[in-house]
Amino acid sequence: MMRVLAAMSGGVDSAVAAARAVDAGHDVVGVHLALSATPGTLRTGSRGCCSKEDAGDARRAADVLGIPFYVWDFADRFKEDVIDDFVAAYAAGETPNPCLRCNEKIKFSALADRAVALGFDAVVTGHYARLSDGVLRRAVDADKDQSYVLAVLTAEQLARAMFPVGDTPKPQIRAEAAERGLAVANKPDSHDICFIPSGDTRAFLGARIGIRPGAVVDADGQVLAEHEGVHGFTIGQRKGLGLPGPAADGKPRYVTDIDPASGTVRVGSAEDLQVRQVRAERAVWTSGRTPEGPIDCVAQVRAHGGTAPATAEAVDGGLVVRLHEPLTGVAKGQAVVLYRPDPLGDEVLGSGTISGTARTHALDGAAGASAR
């Protein structure tokens, strides 16, 4: 038996995860993270994130399970490590993943550190992933798999984590919650960013960054439009570009490059989005050991995004990932996650924060091509 802290967001997944920890014979205490100093500024129902309504749902679930329950205030830490980081990344022309950062800095760092200090052996959450003997794998339910946003965790962090729902499809989790008498059994999922209640990311960023005008240009550098800040754009974006009309060839145009220093947003064709090589910094290897030499793997560059077979190599604390097939919409600030295919469930090898890419024609030696 272990003494386990159950992080209860107020959703069905974390409630069932806590219940399964109780069933396993562990001494379980529930905790809900208060992540906002201002009531009403977090979106209710956001998976893994917490409004006042979610705190009430979590408390009621703990009552049904018969476990102690507390609310811990992590608002200041959340603002500093997640919200401020999110804003700064967009201002720098990057596209961050706040859920990944929350896992890295809050749930499995600040929360886990406090748990260990209080004598707990592990933190249990409702994440959809599988963890056994230190090996992190994709969840059984591919549509709900969250291994991508957990790939930033170190071996030490994984050693004190538990993911009890990763071996079960979501519909069965809901059915189990109903059988247990948990009122959150049919609570809707939310895939929005919890600290942007309106869902309007551009407005949220604009209020904090302000107006930083720049130009939208084509591949030849011709100015097509003006904009109010690079924070309103991400690589692969097609809508909301403010362009006066379609391209001369009639094909859609996408954001292909963002230069925060000059405020320039470059647009081009879908072909211009293709990437064959990814550079990343701050590599994390889930085994705790940095591999020597190239490794064959499968790379994923967005949560629930497509994958490509690849060869990866550790370089100067980061990664160089050579894709055997092109991927599109690869943005700086996102994570590149490396998997090893396995019939038992694809194994997470490691991750890094994308710092640059090279396009297909650049690697093929085409004249005038450039890396970004």
Curated annotation (Swiss-Prot):
Enzyme class, spelled out: transferase
Database matches in CDD domains: MnmA_TRMU-like
UniProt-recorded Gene Ontology molecular function terms: ATP binding; tRNA binding; tRNA-uridine 2-sulfurtransferase activity
Binding site for ATP: A7, M8, S9, G10, G11, V12, D13, S14, L33, G126
UniProt-annotated location(s): Cytoplasm
GO aspect biological process, one term: tRNA wobble position uridine thiolation
One annotated Gene Ontology cellular component of this protein: cytoplasm
Keywords of this entry: ATP-binding, Cytoplasm, Disulfide bond, Nucleotide-binding, RNA-binding, Transferase, tRNA processing, tRNA-binding
Region ranges (Interaction with tRNA): 144-146
Annotated site (Interaction with tRNA): H127, Q334
EC number, UniProt record: 2.8.1.13
Active site: C102 (nucleophile), C194 (cysteine persulfide intermediate)
Chief location of this protein within or outside the cell: cytoplasm
Pfam families tied to this protein: tRNA_Me_trans, tRNA_Me_trans_C, tRNA_Me_trans_M
InterPro entries: MnmA-like, MnmA-like_C, MnmA-like_central, MnmA-like_central_sf, Rossmann-like_a/b/a_fold
Positions of disulphide bridges: C102-C194
Reactions performed catalytically: S-sulfanyl-L-cysteinyl-[protein] + uridine(34) in tRNA + AH2 + ATP = 2-thiouridine(34) in tRNA + L-cysteinyl-[protein] + A + AMP + diphosphate + H(+)
Entry function: Catalyzes the 2-thiolation of uridine at the wobble position (U34) of tRNA, leading to the formation of s(2)U34.
Annotated HAMAP family: tRNA_thiouridyl_MnmA
Family (UniProt): Belongs to the MnmA/TRMU family.
NCBIfam families, per the entry: PRK00143.1 (NF001138), trmU (TIGR00420)
Name this protein carries in UniProt: tRNA-specific 2-thiouridylase MnmA
Organism: Nocardia farcinica (strain IFM 10152)
